[in-house]
């Protein structure tokens, strides 16, 4: 399954990559944005791509034909200030964060992100790497109220209490160890026809638990707090979010930076996909792109 980059032309307009520039892609995953950026910063440019997926980074390194100027490092984008210092790299001219999943990750990650037919037997790890505790272990002991709160807050699931109760009751009898196990428990807790067929009944719960398991909102807040340690003055950040909580964090952080004079908006309102892009790439439907230029 080929990964199609979301809002590609709009990202390029915000980043404005040019020959000799240094651009960081903190979520390099499928590499679609990266290829377009590389075409524009060479010759003379430098590129750093990071991702927590060790297999993906290994693949990118194996196919890298310019290791003196193009670097792929396994790491969390939240730690980019430390990664740049450790690797002896300067502050960047551009930073891209695409906070969505690549088609490859969703199709068969081996980590239980999806409950599709090809993924349902995957272990319920739900983490990008091995640094964080697998979700299957978290679910063995998480209190019912905390579980319900997470599913409601991060997934917007109205029936979070029903789902949390079903998970707790099920784990007393049998552990939830695969993606399919969790999906079955959630579906059984909800009435047929719930969501009116628009999405699978388990989708919101999977989203919520993935966000929790990887501290996705905490990572986003951390990199936003450290943006001046990643970007040089005049450097540009382009951030694509797919969830209202993520977008709100970016919106408020950019607003605070602009008010304090540390940065200026490229676009005050989020850029969204056109009808044509949504038709060709349904993943883009919920994407929102915000951009900012660092001044200090």
Task: Please provide the spans of the model-predicted regions.
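S-adenosyl-L-methionine-dependent methyltransferase catalytic core, i.e., the SAM/SAH-binding region
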Residues: 1-296
């Amino acid at each position: 399954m080929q990964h199609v980059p979301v809002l590609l032309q709009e990202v390029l307009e915000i980043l404005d990559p040019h020959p000799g520039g240094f651009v960081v892609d903190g979520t390099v995953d499928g590499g679609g944005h990266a290829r377009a950026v590389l075409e524009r910063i060479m010759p003379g440019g430098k590129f750093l791509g990071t991702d927590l997926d060790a297999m993906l980074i290994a693949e990118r390194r194996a196919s890298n034909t310019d290791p003196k100027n193009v670097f792929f490092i396994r790491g969390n984008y939240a730690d980019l200030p430390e990664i740049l210092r450790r690797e002896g790299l300067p502050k960047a001219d551009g930073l891209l964060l695409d906070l969505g999943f690549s088609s490859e990750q969703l199709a068969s990650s081996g980590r239980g992100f999806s409950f599709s037919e090809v993924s349902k037997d995957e272990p319920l790890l739900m983490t990008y790497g091995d640094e964080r505790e697998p979700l299957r272990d978290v679910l063995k002991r998480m209190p019912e109220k905390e579980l319900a709160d997470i599913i409601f807050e991060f997934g917007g699931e109205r029936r979070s209490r029903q789902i949390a109760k079903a998970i707790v009751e099920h784990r007393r009898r049998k552990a939830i160890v695969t993606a399919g196990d969790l999906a079955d428990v959630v579906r059984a807790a909800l009435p047929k026809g719930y969501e009116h067929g628009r999405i699978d009944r388990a989708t919101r719960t999977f989203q919520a638990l993935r966000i929790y398991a990887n501290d996705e909102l905490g990572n986003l807040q951390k990199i936003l707090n450290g943006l001046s340690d990643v970007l040089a003055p005049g450097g540009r950040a382009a951030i694509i979010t797919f969830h209202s909580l993520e977008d709100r964090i970016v919106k408020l952080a950019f607003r605070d930076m602009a008010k304090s004079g540390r940065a200026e908006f490229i676009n005050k309102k989020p850029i969204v996909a056109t009808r044509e892009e949504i038709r060709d790439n349904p993943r883009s439907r919920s994407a929102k792109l915000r951009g900012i230029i660092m001044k200090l």
